[in-house]
From Swiss-Prot:
SUPFAM superfamilies xref list: Adenine nucleotide alpha hydrolases-like
Listed InterPro entries: MnmA-like, MnmA-like_C, MnmA-like_central, MnmA-like_central_sf, Rossmann-like_a/b/a_fold
Identification of the protein by name: tRNA-specific 2-thiouridylase MnmA
Active site: C103 (nucleophile), C200 (cysteine persulfide intermediate)
Length: 368
């Protein structure tokens, strides 16, 4: 067995079950394990939602139980500058960003990684992400998590080989029920804690109310694909392609019973376009992506077949990548896809291996 006793690993302790069990598993593997709790958002005293203090208490309880030291660090300024301001800019532009991906890139695998190495003397960091690292080719590769239902490689496509090589993912080889079982056997306070959802580090606030604090709403018309105005939206930023709930336009006399869906956001006209049922305008033959990141840092310079996900937990879509230049690619799906959303990420796979991805700039209904 490898002697890990001289290797220090800093685990990002979120106060959740996955990072708790990750810390325990690393201890079992003989590493010197310490925890780090990151505070990345400054709570407003008037804000009803405040989980950071509870999460910190849970992380501390777990570290005490496991006999681990817990460090704390405040990355709120870095989060605001490098993640949140970009998030607001994207919403202002009528796009739908994914801040969790940017948070992983800028905070967890940059600010945290650098702090752990430089200030705490760590060889590795570890997180509770459901992904795997594979070193069998001589280059660290990012693989999907074993539990396909919890796989989080979609959120980590911006990692470089170097970052993957400096990171450990102890629960990536486990299924979620097994992780909970381990936590229960250890009687950890986080064993039955529900998984967090909502924006990375901002949590489960009412999204509309939260966004309204930072961006003034701009009401505008809701139009059918035929140009008929049938209602008013409170702001394009509150809507995303494929959305059917919360439109407030049901039960119209001149329409069928079929559900209404958002099929487009026309930012220049501040207009939300809707249609009933499986309307062709909701579907795309492909997309253009930019701001590309390849895990091995090698641009794709020739057409390549692989699979793509255009949102988390989506089934793999067989596709063809056609490079336009080193920064931009055209992606053609084998079959039309619904609700391909500008601002979201397209993430590419070769079997179990996460190749990388980019930001969806536009979708198209005929190859462009």
């Amino acid at each position: 067995m490898t002697d890990n006793s001289q290797i220090k690993v800093i685990v990002g302790m979120s106060g959740g079950v996955d990072s708790s069990v990750s810390a325990y598993l690393l201890q079992q593997q003989g590493y010197q394990v310490e925890g780090l709790f990151m505070k990345n958002w400054e709570e407003d005293d008037t804000d009803e939602y405040c989980s950071a203090s509870q999460d910190l208490a849970d992380a501390k309880a777990v570290c005490d139980k496991l006999g681990m030291k817990l460090h704390t660090i405040n990355f709120a300024a870095e989060y605001w500058d490098n993640v949140f301001e970009h998030f607001l800019e994207e919403y202002k532009a009528g796009r739908t960003p994914n801040p969790d991906i940017l948070c992983n890139k800028e905070i967890k695998f940059k600010a945290f990684l650098e702090f752990a190495a430089e200030e705490l003397g760590a060889t590795y960091i570890a997180t509770g992400h459901y992904v795997r690292r594979d070193d069998s080719t001589g280059h660290p590769r990012l693989l999907r998590g074993l539990d396909s239902n919890k796989d989080q490689s979609y959120f980590l496509y911006t990692l470089s080989e170097k970052q993957v090589g400096q990171s450990l993912f102890p629960v990536g080889d486990l299924e979620k029920p097994e992780v909970r079982r381990i936590a229960e056997q250890l009687d950890l306070i986080t064993a039955k804690k529900k998984d967090s959802t909502g924006i990375c580090f901002i949590g489960e606030r009412k999204f509309k109310d939260f966004l309204a604090k930072f961006l003034p709403a701009q009401p505008g018309p809701i139009e059918t694909v035929d140009g008929k105005v049938i209602g008013e939206h409170q702001g394009l930023m509150y809507h995303t392609l494929g959305q059917r709930k919360g439109l407030g336009i049901g039960g119209r006399k001149d329409a069928t019973e079929e559900a209404w869906y958002v099929v487009d956001k026309e930012v220049e006209r501040n207009t939300l376009v809707v249609a009933q049922g499986e309307h062709p305008r909701l579907y795309s033959d492909g997309l253009i992506a930019s701001q590309l990141h390849w895990v091995d840092r090698t641009p794709i310079r020739a057409p390549r077949r692989c699979t793509v996900k255009t949102r988390y937990r989506q089934q793999d879509i067989p596709c063809l990548i056609q490079p336009i230049d080193d920064e931009t690619i055209r992606v053609i799906f084998d079959e039309k896809q619904a609700a391909v959303t500008p601002g979201q990420s397209a993430v590419f796979y070769d079997g179990e291996v996460c190749l990388g991805g980019g930001i969806i700039e536009q979708r198209f209904s005929h190859p462009v």
